[in-house]
Amino acid sequence: FSDKTVSLASWICMPKYAEENRDVLVRFTRALLKAMDYAAADHQEETAALVAKQTALDQETVYEQRGDAEWLTGKQVSEGAADGTVEGYYELQKENFIAAGAVEVDPPVSDYVLLDVMKEAGEY
């Protein structure tokens, strides 16, 4: 299954906002990457409790979902942005959307994913 699809979490902003607020995007992305590292560093129960509270779910249900996917660390994401791995994930996602008829055009991933922000945010 993982060779046919990928589940990506993405945050969206308009191009004008990205141009005018790059520092905000880098700081926000850096915070997300650090949170990913924190959760991966043997803080899964604590993280599940925080997520459960924010999403109004019981902690056990949230904690059990940790095996539903391959959860990357922030460093893995930023390194993957640098070496092309993350771009490949988005390329696969785009191909699946096109095959399903959900997307009609085939733009380069770099037109809609700010890989440079991911790379810069990973410099911590």
Where are the model-predicted features located?
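Short, structured secondary-structure boundary patches
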Residues: F1, P15-K16, A81-T85, A121-Y124
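Short Pro/Gly-enriched coil loops immediately N-terminal to beta-strands
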Residues: F1-S7, Y90
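Conserved C-terminal helix/tail region of periplasmic/extracytoplasmic solute-binding proteins
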Residues: Y90-Y124
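Homeobox/homeodomain signature
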Residues: F1-D3, M14, T61-V62, A102-V103, ...
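A bilobed periplasmic-binding-protein/Venus flytrap-type ligand-binding module shared by bacterial periplasmic
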Residues: V6-D23
